[in-house]
């Protein structure tokens, strides 16, 4: 944790969830309506098909709602894409950009992610920008170089703590059950903080840095207690309210 920075736990449902999944969303909102919700912020990033219904479900609740990607244009001939303005109209407050699955499956570059981030800001969305190295890059001892390049290329100059959140997700840990050591997480987050302060000054010191990659109730306390880890981007464990809330509960004792 970073003193003075309010923690955030964000859930990424990925390509999961249909109408019946809103029951889990209601349970998450109910669990965070108690004193627990005063200890942290929470956001759930659902598939685009659920956004409007999820917004209705979360009306009046403290839980934020996010999309999982957005185009850099406001409209046009981009079949299958969704603009930041569309996400905003559907009820989103946040959007994930640059997730490794987008970088890999759709060959998204840092330059493209930078353009998407600026577009998200223009629409009034908070951008959750993801960075992280592959297994081969870590084995070659290039993890920090890769993270640095992604931060440099994916972030526009207008970054503030209000419009941007950074999520470090080592690619090899996503959905595998594997997690880096506490020492590795600490080193990555310390490096990111250093790079952000060097570029953005005091603004970089106040950005929220999330850890993602096989975060679950059993390892949340260990990971979320690391210096400069200001929350988590949770994948599979966010699909079940009990698991997501158990991760949030970690902040009662940190």
Curated annotation (Swiss-Prot):
Record: active site: 99, 169
Catalytic activity entry: D-glyceraldehyde 3-phosphate = dihydroxyacetone phosphate
Single GO BP term: gluconeogenesis
One annotated Gene Ontology cellular component of this protein: cytosol
Predominant localisation class: cytoplasm
Pathway the protein takes part in: Carbohydrate biosynthesis; gluconeogenesis; Carbohydrate degradation; glycolysis; D-glyceraldehyde 3-phosphate from glycerone phosphate: step 1/1
Alphabetized UniProt keyword annotations: Cytoplasm, Gluconeogenesis, Glycolysis, Isomerase
Positions annotated to bind substrate: 12-14, 175, 214, 235-236
Annotated family: Belongs to the triosephosphate isomerase family.
Role according to the record: Involved in the gluconeogenesis. Catalyzes stereospecifically the conversion of dihydroxyacetone phosphate (DHAP) to D-glyceraldehyde-3-phosphate (G3P).
Matching NCBIfam families: tim (TIGR00419)
The protein's name in its UniProt record: Triosephosphate isomerase
């Amino acid at each position: 944790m970073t003193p003075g920075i309010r923690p955030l736990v964000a859930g990424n449902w990925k390509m999961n969830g249909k109408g019946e999944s809103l029951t889990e969303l209601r349970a998450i909102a109910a669990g965070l309506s108690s004193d627990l919700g005063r200890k942290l912020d929470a956001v759930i990033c659902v598939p685009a098909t659920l956004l409007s219904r999820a917004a209705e479900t979360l009306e009046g609740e403290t839980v934020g709602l996010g999309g999982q990607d957005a185009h850099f244009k406001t409209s046009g001939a981009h079949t299958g894409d969704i603009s930041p303005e569309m996400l905003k109209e559907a009820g989103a407050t946040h959007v994930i950009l640059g997730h490794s699955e987008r970088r890999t499956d759709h060959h998204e570059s840092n330059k493209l992610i930078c353009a998407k981030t600026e577009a998200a800001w223009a629409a009034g969305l908070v951008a959750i920008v993801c960075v992280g190295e592959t297994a081969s890059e870590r084995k070659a001892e290039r993890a920090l170089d890769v993270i640095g390049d992604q931060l440099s290329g994916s972030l526009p100059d207008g970054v503030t703590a209000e419009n941007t959140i950074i999520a470090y997700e080592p690619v090899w840990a996503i959905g595998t059950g594997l997690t880096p050591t506490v020492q590795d997480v600490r080193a990555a987050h310390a490096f990111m903080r250093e790079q952000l302060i060097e570029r953005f000054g005091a603004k970089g010191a106040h950005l929220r840095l999330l850890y993602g990659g096989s975060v679950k109730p059993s390892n949340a306390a260990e990971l979320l207690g690391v210096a400069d880890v200001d929350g988590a981007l949770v994948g599979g464990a966010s699909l079940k309210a009990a698991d997501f809330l158990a991760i949030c509960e970690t902040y009662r004792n940190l």
